[in-house]
UniProtKB/Swiss-Prot annotation:
Residues 2-77 form the Carrier domain. PROSITE patterns: CARRIER, PHOSPHOPANTETHEINE. The lineage of its organism: Bacteria, Pseudomonadati, Pseudomonadota, Betaproteobacteria, Burkholderiales. Coiled coil: none annotated. It is found in: Cytoplasm. It comes from Cupriavidus necator (strain ATCC 17699 / DSM 428 / KCTC 22496 / NCIMB 10442 / H16 / Stanier 337) (Ralstonia eutropha). 4'-phosphopantetheine is transferred from CoA to a specific serine of apo-ACP by AcpS. This modification is essential for activity because fatty acids are bound in thioester linkage to the sulfhydryl of the prosthetic group. The gene is acpP. This is Acyl carrier protein.
Length: 79
């Protein structure tokens, strides 16, 4: 089973059409990876599906980097 970091990066790569090798933990979805507002919504939905969690809108707005997504998933993933 992949760890959370690998799973988050795989989702980001699939959703944003970027190579996993180009995704760094500090990468900003918008500034570094070229996401627009629709991309970020779809990314949050994909993370919710992958990890079986719900991310409230006010929390989703705070997730702007790969590391923040990893941290959120780590803290909220259902075992």
């Amino acid at each position: 089973m992949d760890n959370i970091e690998q799973r988050v990066k795989k989702i980001v790569a699939e959703q944003l059409g970027v190579a996993e090798a180009d995704i760094k933990n500090e990468s900003s979805f918008v500034n570094d990876l070229g996401a627009d507002s629709l991309d970020t919504v779809e990314l949050v939905m994909a993370l919710e599906d992958e990890f079986g969690m719900e991310i409230p809108d006010e929390e989703a707005e705070k997730i702007t980097t790969v590391q923040q997504a990893i941290d959120y998933a780590t803290a909220h993933v259902k075992a």
